[in-house]
Design a protein with these regions (language model features):
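A glycine-rich dinucleotide-binding beta-alpha-beta segment and adjacent secondary-structure elements
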Residues: 138-148, 365-429
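Active-site-proximal substrate-binding core of FAD-dependent oxidoreductases
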Residues: 208, 448-453
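A conserved FAD-binding loop/helix module that cradles the flavin
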Residues: 36, 425-447
């Protein structure tokens, strides 16, 4: 966005490849995604279409998921299918729950209220229970959100819930390829407009002089000067990069460091035998218990629900790799914090194996014999994400938003240092939709700053 406006942009990426949670990684001959599984609102006129069109991302091979069923939900001994399009979706839910027609009409109206200030101050769970009386329908309306946000009854704002659900009901899309395609497209766009992206540049310090950041210092000894600095690291990490500062107050640093974070994700990546399973153009969500608002894996290691996503096959009509995701609390892996990637202790590996076994058991209730189709597996935990992306507690969605105190949990892109800005999922909204909108807002604030100066 800034490069297109004529600014000279330099991106410093701490990892060997750019992209953060959008990137994919290679094992054997396959690429596996870390965070990009499907995207909502890419139809013309949809919530993300204009932004993606402007960024050149609509040139990528997006494939729409099944119109009649992009989410297949197995919960409470029944199967529910979500179709795309708000009207079709509401009608489908009415066919499952005809006695909830009035509440579902109100829910349909809610999906259009994505910019209402009142939603930031409204508890999502309390609002949903005020319009929906059937407890199973409440779970069906929430199930696909389990790996999109932290479904926490006590704190989740209605604003966050609706923004995480509505774009996908508009339309849902998978990329015919891996997340690196999206990352490469963005990098190419930056370079086409005169910018640059440098990898293996781990910023360890932001140097301040006369009330402004003047330099970014990297672990390899290199340094870079600029007029404006934008950090998409977690706000607590951003604050730690700034040394002694007369402008960045201790109370602000303390607030960023003490703010509760959302849970992380356990991901099980499966490589399947060739030709063993036909491709399914939808997600499968499977729940051991009919309560998706309390399902994060804790120290008991009980897996209560999973989401399954299949990669679009490059050739033929059979699945080659599947990702299985389930929420996981930081407390499960906290004792292993400080151990090194690929050199974790035996107990950590045993813990991952126990969780993976339960994920597979749930998956086999809807795909019988899946275990026999598997060639290889890999898995990651919140600790993996912390070590790669420096996200405190391996949080999947950044700061926990709280309806009861939105001013404390919704962070401004502006910091107390006039030329240091922040962006990313801890600010306004998380997810691909959220960080795109937040990035646009950050750019607006930078432009305001430039005009005022």
């Amino acid at each position: 966005m800034m490069a297109k406006e004529g600014r000279k942009v330099l991106v410093l990426e701490r990892q060997h490849q750019a992209g953060g949670c959008m990137q994919s990684y290679r094992r054997g001959r396959l690429n596996f995604d870390t965070g990009l599984h499907y995207v909502g609102g890419l139809e013309e006129g949809g919530q993300l279409y204009d932004a993606f069109e402007s960024l050149g991302l609509m040139t990528l091979p997006w494939k729409q998921m099944d119109a009649d069923c992009f989410e297949e939900i197995h919960i409470g001994g029944r199967t529910f299918r979500w179709p795309q399009g708000k009207k079709r979706f509401i009608n489908a839910m009415k066919s499952y729950f005809p006695e909830e027609e009035k509440g579902l009409d109100l829910y349909g109206e809610l999906l259009d209220c994505t910019d209402e200030l009142w939603m930031q101050k409204t508890n999502a769970w309390e609002y949903l229970t005020s319009i929906i009386s059937d407890p199973l329908l409440l779970q069906v309306l929430s199930a696909p959100a389990t790996c999109k946000m932290e479904l926490r009854k006590e704190t989740l704002p209605l604003f966050t819930y609706v923004h995480g659900i509505a774009p996908f009901i508009e339309s849902s899309w998978r990329l015919a390829g891996d997340g690196n395609m999206l990352v490469s497209c963005l990098v190419e766009q930056i370079r086409a407009y005169g910018g640059e992206v440098l990898t293996d540049k781990d910023v360890v310090s932001l140097k301040e002089e006369n009330g402004r950041i003047v330099q970014a210092l990297c672990a390899d000894g290199t340094s870079y000067e600029a007029g404006f600095f934008v950090s998409n690291a977690h706000p607590a990490v951003t604050c730690s990069l700034v040394g002694e500062s007369a402008l960045m107050k201790k109370v602000f640093r303390r607030r960023m460091g003490m703010q509760p974070n959302t849970f992380g994700i356990f991901t099980l990546h499966l490589q399947l035998r060739s030709g063993s399973l036909p491709y399914f153009n939808h997600n499968k969500l499977v729940f051991a218990e009919p309560d998706c608002w309390d399902m994060a894996v804790d120290k008991s290691l009980a897996v209560k629900g999973i989401m399954m996503s299949a990669r679009i096959p490059e050739k033929g009509g059979n699945v080659v790799n599947i990702d299985i995701l389930t929420p996981m609390l930081w407390e499960v892996v906290e004792e292993y914090d400080g151990t090194k990637l690929f050199h974790r202790p035996k107990a950590y590996k045993e813990m991952k194996a126990r969780v993976a076994e339960q994920c597979l058991a749930l998956a086999e209730t809807v795909i019988p014999g899946l275990g026999e189709m598997i060639l290889k597996t890999w898995s990651s935990t919140p600790l993996t994400y912390k070590d790669y992306n420096l996200t405190p507690e391996g949080s999947a969605f950044g700061f926990r938003k709280d309806f009861s105190n939105p001013m404390m949990t919704i962070v401004s892109p502006k910091t107390q240092i006039p030329n240091l800005f922040m962006t990313g999922q801890s600010l306004m909204l998380h997810g691909l939709h959220g960080v795109t909108m937040t990035a646009a807002y950050t750019c607006q604030e930078i432009n305001k700053n430039t005009i005022s100066e």
